[in-house]
Regions:
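C-terminal helical subdomain
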Residues: 169, 184-219
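Active-site helix of classical SDR
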Residues: 107, 143
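Short alpha-helical oligomerization interface
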Residues: 84-97
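N-terminal Rossmann NAD(P)H-binding glycine-rich loop of SDR-like oxidoreductase domains
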Residues: 10, 18
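Residue(s) in the substrate-gating loop at a strand-loop-helix junction
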Residues: 127
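Rossmann-fold cofactor-recognition segment
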Residues: 42-56
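Conserved NAD(P)H cofactor-binding loop of Rossmann-fold oxidoreductase domains
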Residues: 77-83
Length: 236
C-alpha cells in the first residue's frame, strides 16, 4: 500500500485531497495546526498537529513518517495569504514565515527523507500569484514565486544527484476556501473538490507544473507577456 502525508489537511484543498487518496486505496497521514478538524476526514492512519512555523516541525514530520511506516508521497497545502495594501508589518512577516520559512522547512525535510530512500514524490500547492508581483498582496505573491523557484531548484538538484524524486507544482487561482476574504467578490472562483480532482490527475501523471483551470493558464500566459512599465501602472 502506498503511503502519503498531507501537510495542511484540516480544510479546503488538503482536506479534499486526503479524502480522494483514501478512496484510491492510499495509507494516509494528515497534519495541520487545527488537529481537531483532521478527525473529520475519515479513516486516516495518522493525524498530527504540526505548525510549519515551529522550529521543531520537521522533527514532527519525521516522527509521523516513522509512525506511518514510511512515505511515498508528500503533499504540501499549508499556507496563508492576505491582501495588505497598507503593508502592515505583522502581515508581511507572518506570511513570509509561513509561506517562506515554513515551506522550506517541511519541503526540505521531505526531500532529505526521499534522498535517503532514493525515490519519492513531492507535491506542493503554490499559486498563480507567483507569476508576477501583485501590489495588493506583496508578501504573498513574493513567497509564492519563491516556492515555484525552490521546487525547480530541488528538481534540478535531485536530477544531478541521480535521485528518483518527482516534483509537482500545483498552481491554482482563486479557490473557495477559508484563505479568501469573504467580503470580496473573486472572479473565476473554483471549488476545492474540483481542484482536488485535478491534483490527483497531476499526481498520477507526475506532472511538473499544473495550473488549475484553462482560464488561469491563459491568464498567467498573458501576465508573463506584459512589460514591466505597463504592469506597474495596472490597477489590481
Amino acid at each position: 500500500m502506498k503511503r502519503a502525508i498531507i501537510i495542511g489537511a484540516s480544510s479546503g484543498i488538503g482536506f479534499e485531497v486526503a479524502r480522494l487518496l483514501l478512496d484510491d486505496g492510499w495509507k494516509v497521514g494528515v497534519a495541520a495546526r487545527r488537529v481537531d478538524l483532521l478527525q473529520t476526514i475519515g479513516n486516516v492512519s495518522e493525524a498530527e498537529q504540526i505548525d510549519v512555523t515551529d522550529p521543531n516541525a520537521a522533527e514532527h514530520l519525521r516522527s509521523m513518517i516513522s509512525q506511518l511506516g514510511g512515505m511515498d508521497l508528500l503533499i504540501y497545502t499549508a499556507g496563508i495569504g492576505k491582501q495588505n495594501r497598507e503593508l502592515t508589518e505583522g502581515i508581511e512577516v507572518q506570511t513570509t514565515e509561513t509561506n517562506g520559512v515554513g515551506f522550506v522547512r517541511m519541503i526540505g525535510e521531505a526531500y532529505r527523507y526521499f534522498a535517503e530512500k532514493g525515490e519519492g514524490h513531492i507535491v506542493a500547492v503554490t499559486s498563480i500569484a507567483g507569476t508576477k508581483g501583485l501590489g495588493p498582496a506583496p508578501a504573498y505573491s513574493a513567497t509564492k514565486a519563491m516556492q515555484n523557484v525552490y521546487l525547480q531548484a530541488l528538481e534540478q538538484q535531485a536530477h544531478a544527484r541521480g535521485l528518483d524524486i518527482h516534483f509537482t507544482d500545483i498552481r491554482p487561482g482563486f479557490v473557495d476556501t477559508a484563505l479568501l476574504n469573504g467580503d470580496f467578490h473573486y472572479p473565476m472562483l473554483m471549488q476545492p473538490e474540483m481542484v482536488a480532482r485535478k491534483i490527483m490527475q497531476a499526481i498520477k501523471r507526475k506532472q511538473h507544473i499544473c495550473v488549475i483551470d484553462w482560464r488561469y493558464h491563459l491568464l498567467t500566459m498573458l501576465w508573463r507577456r506584459i512589460p514591466r512599465f505597463i504592469w506597474r501602472r495596472m490597477k489590481l
